[in-house]
Every structure is written in C-alpha cells, then in structure tokens.
Amino acid sequence: MNEDQFPKAYDPKSSETGVYSFWERSGMFVANASSEKPAYSIVMPPPNVTGILHMGHALVNTLQDTLIRYKRMQGFEVCWVPGTDHAGIATQTVVERHLKASLGKRRTDFSREEFLKHVWDWKEKSQNVILSQLRQLGCSCDWSRQRFTMDPGANRAVKKAFKILFDKGVIYRGYYLVNWDPILQTALADDEVEYEERDGWLYYIRYQVVNSEEFITVATTRPETLLGDTAIAVSPEDQRYSHLIGAKVVVPFVNREIPIIGDFSVDASFGTGAVKITPAHDKDDYKTGMNHQLPMINILTPTGEINENGGIFTGLSREVARENIITSLEALGLFVKKEAYSSRVGVSYRSGAIIEPYLSKQWFVSVDSFRDSLREFVNSEEIRIFPPEFVRNYLTWVNNLKDWCISRQLWWGHRIPVWHNKHDENVICFDGEGGPEEVMRDPESWYQDPDVLDTWFSSGLWPLTCFGWPDEDSLDLKKFYPTAVLVTGHDILFFWVTRMVLMCSAMVDTEPFSDVFLHGLIFGKSYREYDEKGEWFYVSGERKRDYDKGKALPKNVVAKWEKLSKSKGNVIDPIEMIEAYGADAVRLTLCSCANRGEQIDLDYRLFEEYKNFINKLWNGARFIFGHISELTSRDLEEGVNQDLLGLEDFYILDRFNELLDLIDGHYNCYSFDKIASLAYDFFKNDLCSTYLEIIKPTLFGKQGSDQQRATKRKLLATLLINILGVLHPIVPYITETLFQKLKATLGTVENGKGDSVTGHAVSMLRSEACMVAEYPKPIHVAFPQGLRESFGIAERLVYTIRNIRGEMQLDPREPLQAFVISSEKKELVDVCIPIMCALGGVKTVEQLAEAPKDSIFSLGVVEGIQVGVILPPEHLAKERVRLEKEKTRLEKSIDSVSKLLASEDFRTRANPSLVQAKKDSLRNSQRELQSILDKLASL
C-alpha cells in the first residue's frame, strides 16, 4: 500500500483542522428550521467568559456532541446552539483583578461605562478563545446561531420576562435578610452560599436587667452583633427565666433598652437557655423579630465594617470589633467566659468571604406559585432526570424552595428594568427600548435601578432566548423548542436546571427540555508528601507527572482523588491533552468515564490507553484497506453470496447487530461509558482479535476459494463502513478521515443498492461525509440455528488449546498439532477447525475416532468434544499434574450440582428450564471427568 495514500501512523494534528474545516465549510452544522425532519435540539450550557475551557467543559460538550452526531445520523434535524455566559459576579471579579494587576486601578476608579467597556473587551477575547477550543474538541454546533447571555436578543427576553413576572406580582422589592458578600459587596442567593464546619468560640455575656440588680447571661458565637440587639429571648417553659419575661435589659455600649421575650423557638438546653436577638444579622433572629415586631438595626456597612449604629466601634472591621468588644466587656465585668465551639459558617462560592446576614432592600421572585408545577413536571415524567436517584434531590429542593433574591449590586449584568421616582415611591417597569414615556418627558425626576439581575435569571431563560423568544413567530422557537435534553453537572441542578424549569414554564407554560442528564464531577489525582514532622504539601511538576504515569509512590507520598484545583496541582488542561493525544482520544476518554455517579476519577493513563485504541483503529483499518483496495463500490452494490458465509462471518454480523441494539438502549438512558466500552470492545476484540485473525488465511490465499476470498473482502468493507458509523459520534475526526479514504478507494456509488448485507454500507457511501451518513442499521442474513452456541463451542475449544499451551509452557510461537474426537458433532467440528487453527495457533487439527496410542498428548473436553494437543515426551509429568487439577475441579462441580439436584425443594420450586440446565451441566461434567480419568489411566 502506498505510504502517501495511507500512512503507517495516524497523526491527529495533520488531519483534525482540515476535517473540521471541511465539515464547517460544507454547512453540515447548520440546522434548517423549515425542515420536515423530526427536530432534536440542545442548547449548550454556556461557558463563563472568565477565561478558557476546563475539563468539565470538555466533558459536557463531548457528551452533547456525541448525542448530536448520533441523532444527526439517525435522520433528525439537529440544532445545537452554542453560546457563552456573561457570569456577572465571576467575570466582574476577574476583570477587577486584571485591571488591578495591569493598571493598578480599582473598579471605582472608573465610571460605570468605562469599566463596562473593559469588561466587554475581556468578554470578546475570552469568548474567542472558548469558541476556538470548542472547535478543537470537534463540537458540531450551529455557529450561525451562536448566542451570548447579554446579546441584544437575550436582553430583550430578560426585560420581557421581568415585566411579565412584575405585572403578575411575582417579582417584588422589599427589605429582607440576604446573604451579603462583603468582598464583592453584593447579595447572593441561598444556593450560592457554601457551608463549612469551622472551629470557633461560644462567648458568654451578661446583660443587666433594668431597675434591678439581676443580670441575664446569654451565649453567642458573634458578640460583635450585640450592637444590633433588639431583644433577649427565653423559652416560656423555662422556669429559670419566667419571672423576667416582659422585663428589659440594657445593651452594653449603646445603652439601648430591649425587652426579654418568651419564644418557643428557643432551645433551653443551648448555652444558658437565653439568647440575644439581632434581627438584622441572623436568619433565625429575623423570623423571631418579625413574629414579635421587633426593630431591625443594621450595624454593618456593605464592606463589613461597623456603621454609625455601632457607637465607639464605628469603622472597625467585624473581626477587630469582636476583639475590642470582648476586651471592653471584660473591663465592665460583663464578660463571663468563652468555650470552644464548632459551627456551620456560610462562605461565598465566588470570593470565599464569610457571608454576612444583612438587612437590605432587594428584588425577589416569589416562588410559592411555581412549587406545584415544578414538582409535577418531574413526577409526571414530562421531564425525566437521569440518573433517577437525583429526582429525590430535585423534589427535596423544590419542597424547601425560598423566595429567590434576584438583584445584585454589580455593574456587569442585565440592569433591572425598573425606574424609580426621586420624589415618591412610584416605580415603572418597562421592557421596551430606551425608557418609559414618563422618564423621557421628565428625566430629572427618575433614575433607573442601579442593580443588575442575578446571572441565573438570564440563564434561566437560555432555552427560550436561544430560539428567538419573545418572538412567538420565530421559526426556530416553533421547530426546536422545547429542547430534547439538557446535559450538565449535578452540582448545578439547583442553581440552573430548576430555575430554567421555573422561568421557561412561567413564560410559555411548557417544560424547557424533555430529559436532564446530570454527569458526575471530575476529580483528579493529587499527591501529598509528608515530612518528618508530619506536615505535608502537594507534589507538582515532573514528579507529579511521573506518578500519574504509574511510577511507584514513596512511603511518604499519599495519592488522593480530589476536585480539580490549581492549588492541589491536579488540574488537567483539555487543550494540552488534545495537543498530546488528539481530540478523539480525549473524547473517548471522557465518554468512557462519564458514569452515572457523582464523581469521575480522571486518570492520566486513560488518555494513553485510548490514544492506543485510536492507533489500533487506524492500523486495523489500514490492514483492511490492504485487502479491499481492488474492490469498487459496484462490487458492494452487487451484494454477497450468503451461501459462502462461514460460521465466523455469521458470528461477526450477529455481534454487530447485538452491538447496535445495546448501544441504542444506552443512548436512550445516557450511559455514555457503556456506549464507549461496547464500541471499543467490538472493534478491538470481536473484529480485530477474533474475526480478522480467523479470516487471515483466506485473505492471504492459504485456504478457501477465490469466491470465498471475494466474499470476505466485501464483508470486511461493509463492516468497516458500518463500524466507522457507530464510532463516529464519539471519535469523529479519525472516522471521518477513514470514511473519506473509503470513498476514494471504492469510488462513486452508481445506482445499485446492494443487498441485505451490503445495502446500508452502499447507502452510507453515497453521503458526502460520515457525519451526515445514515447511522448503521442491523444487517439481515439467514443466521443459522444455534449460531451463538456453535461459535461459543469454537471459542471454548480455542480456549482449551490456549490453556494447554500455557500450562504446558509451550512456546507461543510453536505451531501445534491437535486432534478432535467427537462421534456426535462431526459437522460442527468441521466448521470449528479453521477457527481453532487461526486463533489457537494450531498447524493441523485431525478428527479421530479415538486418541492416538503412540503419542503423548494433553486432553480437554468441551460439550462432549475431546480436544487433544500432541506434546513432546518431556511434558508427560506436567500433563499429569494438569489433569489432576482438572479432575479435582470437575469432582467439586459434580458434587455441588448433584447435591442441588438431590434437593426436592430445588426440583419442585425452581424453574423447569433451570433444573434441566443443571442436569445437562451434570451430564457434561461427568462425561468430561470420565475422559480425564481415562487419560490419567493411559498415562
């Protein structure tokens, strides 16, 4: 074969760019909203424009592209909309850091417009990198429909949705205790707060009762908030304090008199049984304050410092104020003690700041009216969640859903479309261009709300905005909405998935997608090295890479699977992996890992393994090309003579049909790991290691007729075309490269359609590309009765020969002489002999009536068929040992099955077919044992 036509080694770098350009140039990614084909649509979870793609993006987009390519080949009008997310808090934070590092300036050194220009510039650069990386990965998105969560269409949709909910009274504004990030200086939704168990202190503080010598002691983890105390609460059933209910105490430093109240929410066993109530800085206290109509005093600034309500502590940070207050309380004799105490602390998922419960006026979405529909979509399976164990998580979250704080104190994001009157409480919600008429007439009297919307508000509308909503006449909206499936990580089930269901159903009264597949989160292997003192640090650099590749770990180094993190040194860059191993190997690795669990352990060695498979695919195809180079498409159009098909041919066709059936089922439930494993095993084991090895003697003219050789070649071409189609959704680059080589080799398809064996392959060759070819279908032939059983016997005969070779320590390169004894299955043995020769490394196999008396041989039995391998004289002792081991195994098996069959309970209760199977098994084992005993006697 010409090296230029088909190089010995596959080079991903030299082919991937050209192949992708061919697809894109040919318009194969573009969806047609006017098509009569059934629609299949996906909207890409938009990557944040904060930087570049990470391995999680590579995973989710590989899985989506696999589905899109599969459905495209199945004849659907597929539409995969790519896009990026403005990611309000995250992007603003990144840009602020960038400006600080590059210009030495803070956000507040710019006007709002100037700062936003910097953010838009950042967005353009980041987005261009992200989209380029998606192309490298092989994503077959419809780039003509590319969206951004702050593009004009998205902005129009956001304003429309806000006004719809505002007019219904679902969106409201009010004072509420929000999760405040003092670093980012914005409110966060409840599910944007992560909770950590942290060690701290429980402080005991005394308050003096007014007009009394008595004191009441409380226990608190936050003594600095006493500046905002508006009550002391005790349980009405606590006899220690019942006489004090209704009395007042003095708050130290601010000299405010506050009541002692009775409230059943107080746990009398906690601390002293008395608790301070600070409604403006604690969620439980806020509820108590509302129930008792207590004043709410905010003591903090947006940056987390004590405000003017803090008296002498004004201007101090929370931490410094705490220390100073404790010192001052000690001086006043009001500090009792402190005890070690562990508590859950809320932390910002973005900045890492300790969250401050903060009384603030914010915009909210009332969720009460949505709770029933959110449950019903999933309970009725209008939306199916995979894996199904996440249904419980979803429903639990919906049942505990709280009003959603949607306003953020940022500059980057969708401005809230509300204008406030400077002179009264009037507000106008406006979703058009420009501003409301009233504002246009008297701009000096109005101002637009300075806050922006939570990123998840616009992301919640993503499936709608991608297809043109609120334009209800949009062809895309009519054709492609709702979408088929949402593929995303289980960690944003609540952040995003549920909010999409809420927002989209609120706008158009239908679910945004039919299925949700939640993949696991990627974990990488990190290595902790311990020193003599027991302190440890993360291993990085070359040493880490050596460990990743399998180098033995020293005793003081411990490996651990952890979430990907730069600080842990376990981040895996998908683009680096593509450069090193090729996009197909990366995609196959990710699909093979995409299990339905919560954690994906991504081992570096997997990339190497699947790169080897890509090379195996190339080499296997190259071998096949060497034997079909004289074929033309016309030969395939003529079909094959099924009378010339052998057991091995029927076997591989049956295995292929079984592969299609299994893969289809796994696609339906998003078992990507099983799809990858099945396709991998079929090509590597069934096609290459088994079928190709069996037919090599025929291909090389060592056995069989010219007609049989021609049939094998047609079948090889047919199988290669079809398996390329099966593999294409997962490994598109190499399959497209090989498909184009097949088209060039076999030539233009004429008018013939082929037969039931070659027909679909002929149909695929008519396609411009593998990507748009029809997905393979089962190959129909008259399969012989008992095919699987017959080939199974052939495989077991081969296994027996290989086992004898191994146990006798015979040279694996030495061709063996074998014989078979079977009075009842001579025809089956005749069919099996070529397979035994090809796969068992046997030179000749003779059918005999009895074992040769003048030879030393090793004997095995399969289904009553005795198979023997002639041995050199020096192997006599080894054969005796082997037979004794086999005799022991069979005796144990016979004893076990005999006891089972002797049980009347088993015979009467078990399925009759199972009882018969056990009887047959016993009979075969007894027959095999007798053969072993005869052989031992002869030795």
Curated annotation (Swiss-Prot):
Pfam families: Anticodon_1, tRNA-synt_1, Val_tRNA-synt_C. Its main location: cytoplasm. Residues 874-939 form a coiled coil. Keywords: Aminoacyl-tRNA synthetase, ATP-binding, Coiled coil, Cytoplasm, Ligase, Nucleotide-binding, Protein biosynthesis. InterPro entries: aa-tRNA-synth_I_CS, aa-tRNA-synth_Ia, Anticodon_Ia_Val, M/V/L/I-tRNA-synth_anticd-bd, Rossmann-like_a/b/a_fold, tRNA-bd_arm, tRNAsynth_Ia_anticodon-bd, Val-tRNA_synth_C_sf. One of its GO terms (molecular function) is valine-tRNA ligase activity. PROSITE patterns: AA_TRNA_LIGASE_I (PS00178). One of its GO terms (biological process) is valyl-tRNA aminoacylation. One of its GO terms (cellular component) is cytosol. It is found in: Cytoplasm. It catalyses: tRNA(Val) + L-valine + ATP = L-valyl-tRNA(Val) + AMP + diphosphate. CDD domains: Anticodon_Ia_Val (cd07962), ValRS_core (cd00817). ATP binds at K566. A motif ('KMSKS' region) lies at residues 563-567. The keyword Aminoacyl-tRNA synthetase applies. A motif ('HIGH' region) lies at residues 47-57. It is an enzyme of class 6 (ligase). Its EC number is 6.1.1.9. Monomer. ValRS has two distinct active sites: one for aminoacylation and one for editing. The misactivated threonine is translocated from the active site to the editing site. The C-terminal coiled-coil domain is crucial for aminoacylation activity. Catalyzes the attachment of valine to tRNA(Val). As ValRS can inadvertently accommodate and process structurally similar amino acids such as threonine, to avoid such errors, it has a 'posttransfer' editing activity that hydrolyzes mischarged Thr-tRNA(Val) in a tRNA-dependent manner. Belongs to the class-I aminoacyl-tRNA synthetase family. ValS type 1 subfamily. This is Valine--tRNA ligase.
